[in-house]
Amino acid sequence: MNFNNFTIKSQEAVQEAVNLVQSRGQQAIEPAHILHGVMKVGENVTNFIFQKLGMNGQQVALVVDKQIESLPKVSGGEPYLSRESNEVLQKATQYSKEMGDEFVSLEHILLALLTVKSTVSTILKDAGMTEKELRNAINELRKGEKVTSQSSEDNYQSLEKYAINLNEAARSGKLDPVIGRDEEIRRVLQILSRRTKNNPILIGEPGTGKTAIVEGLAHRILRGDVPENLKNKQVYSLDMGALVAGAKYKGEFEERLKSVVNEVKKSEGDIILFIDEIHTLVGAGKGEGAMDAANILKPALARGELRSIGATTLDEYQKYFEKDKALERRFQIVQVDEPDTLSTISILRGLKERYENHHHVRIKDDAIIAAVELSSRYITDRFLPDKAIDLMDEAAAKLRMEVDSVPEELDEISRKIKQLEIEREAIKRENDKPKLEIIGKELAELKEVEKSFKAKWQSEKTLMDKIQQNKVEIENLKFEAEKAEREGDYGKVAEIRYGKLQALDKEIEDTQEKLRGMQGDKAMIKEEVDAEDIADVVSRWTGIPVSKMMQSEKDKLLHLEDELHQRVIGQDEAIEAVADAVRRSRAGLQDPKRPIGSFIFLGTTGVGKTELAKALAEFLFDDESMMTRIDMSEYQEKHSVSRLVGAPPGYVGYDEGGQLTEAIRRKPYSVVLFDEIEKAHPDVFNILLQVLDDGRLTDNKGRVVNFKNTIIIMTSNMGSSYIQSQMEKLSGSNKEEVIEETKKEVMNMLKKNIRPEFLNRIDETIMFLPLTETEIRQIVLLQIKGVQKMLAENGVELEMTDAALNFLSQVGYDPEFGARPVKRAIQRYLLNDLSKKLLSQEVDRSKAIIVDSNGDGLVFRN
């Protein structure tokens, strides 16, 4: 027998029969073995045929297996085809020629198994198979196609295998309702009604609802709310994954796609093919000698034989379609723009019920409004309605987890009970009866409280679950009513709408009343998603604090100046300006189109300009390293400017992004410090103009980075020598005049060096004054606290006398260099000598070390 003219599936079926013979210890390959092989290898073929003929495939398989088991067992021989099996395969070859096929397929073998007289033909006839019905089923399966390749069976029912029927999905309630988008759906219907080139392509940003428009079309077709020429049409969504998966041989992918196209063509306009991410077809399957998948579609698309809807993003359309003009002209563009906030709110209101039934919680209307407003303000790299839906979904999931978990009060009581029980066991051993009685009494009280709490929690949970079950039932009944209305069963519609639904609504109302009565003023379970839950999710996503402030945080913000003064000594004007900006932001009064605040700090070196930025970062994020610091001395050359936003295409480092833009994309809520701006190239200021004005910056990949939640601080030593010389003139009487005059002159210097359009965008320009001796002494105290803390970690206690502090203040005071000499003085006079004394054991580290001054230096004693 020559198996070269058999399809791959037919060869596999015969091989399966051989394997079965060997595994059962038999020798002759009987028709029963071949039928077993056909049913195992060609499930899609036999299942379709058995279904069409009303046969029970599982029952047939059991009878065949019993027949195989009854065949004689022979050991040691080579498997061979029995006379009947040989006749079956010969007959199958004959049938393939009769039908005009090039290869013997599984249907030919099945037809031969029925017509060649054997026990198997009897089994098939008894199960209800006749030759005429089998031939009809084969024709229906093939849809008029001939077997022209060895993988032909893979292409039967190709739409069922490689596409998803959206009409069926809508009919069974698997698709979410589509709210709005009427204009876009109308445009799609208009294009689909054309004679040729009737292929709309939906183009829009990710998450704007392109796929939802096609789902909306499927819903409309189901309701009959479409023009006459589109009524009863089927919408199939092409599954690219299934199309490519398992295509091992060259040309197999193209063959599958061709069979899908042919099936759509044969429907004569009854099938509309939806290709999501259509750009994946351009270049798919292309290789040595193979044709691009898009080229297979082109002829059918141009002639109007294939009605298809594509969906892709703007970027992908430009990248793939605009290069291929022949493909581009076959599609008509439907622009899908991001909906505005009002449209998005109505979309979320329409979806609310679906999410409530899924999560078994209620979603308040203010949560929907908050989801839209907060997502459009703070999540700028994604699009509505997708990001707002995600917020609502996650907030509901979070609340559901809390509902299913034990309430916090109950958990605390349970932990306390466990702790007391452990204590009681320990005291039992000591035989301390009075203590045992006290603990026993406390335990009994706590257990009573726990019992009542548990009962209340369980009761609330039971009532909530009952409400949600009723809501799910309502949704199912509404779906049933819609189905009955489509089928014209108006009696059932009336029974559901005016009977069952009203009864369930009443039941929900009664249960809610009961729940409210049980909860009173204090509910144990929170059952509603509110705006605060949404704000909490936004904070987790972005790190931006948008949730309501606790009282402790309000107090902290009101006394922010004191917090900052713990690290920065003096400079009241600067601290007040920064604190006001932070308070405006947290109170929701900042301009939403600009950064929280932008400042230029001027002054001599070492007066606290950079330290204030660090102190602010520590206050906001509990970690000063959360500050994004850009040292402008690194940007002195013109070409180095590109490092801020990323190298242009074609240059090394293009994929890495910019130092500034990447830092803010990852941490949108941060303090950005541009240190020593006078050292930067003038072109850097051009880049910063749009950051200060619009709170946005476009990086090298065209992504817009949002700076609206950043505090921008720039420091400069400009005019420091002038400030220094002026401060020497200070005396008690003329202090205010000299400071004002100095500020005026420094501002003039700033205007000469930095362009007016840049300075005009800065919120406040603040001059830091040189530090006085009193302030230097405070800085010494601050730094000594740090030293004491460090020594305490090593078990050494350090005490400073006033004389020692005064000495360090004197040697550390240098008006020209600010506070930096203090650190050097502490290192030189205190730490260096102390380390020597500790190593030589001149001082006892187990006792407190007292540091005093003799006027020339520091002395150490215990």
UniProtKB/Swiss-Prot annotation:
Binding site for ATP 2: 603-610
Keywords on record: ATP-binding, Chaperone, Coiled coil, Cytoplasm, Nucleotide-binding, Repeat, Stress response
Stretches assigned to coiled coil: 389-520
Annotated region (Repeat 1), positions in chain: 6-71
GO molecular-function term, one example from the UniProt record: ATP hydrolysis activity
Subcellular location(s) per record: Cytoplasm
Span list, region NBD1: 157-338
One BP term from GO: protein refolding
Family as reported in the entry's similarity comment: Belongs to the ClpA/ClpB family.
Subunit relationships: Homohexamer. The oligomerization is ATP-dependent.
Recorded domain comment: The Clp repeat (R) domain probably functions as a substrate-discriminating domain, recruiting aggregated proteins to the ClpB hexamer and/or stabilizing bound proteins. The NBD2 domain is responsible for oligomerization, whereas the NBD1 domain stabilizes the hexamer probably in an ATP-dependent manner. The movement of the coiled-coil domain is essential for ClpB ability to rescue proteins from an aggregated state, probably by pulling apart large aggregated proteins, which are bound between the coiled-coils motifs of adjacent ClpB subunits in the functional hexamer.
Stated name of the protein: Chaperone protein ClpB
Species name: Bacteroides thetaiotaomicron (strain ATCC 29148 / DSM 2079 / JCM 5827 / CCUG 10774 / NCTC 10582 / VPI-5482 / E50)
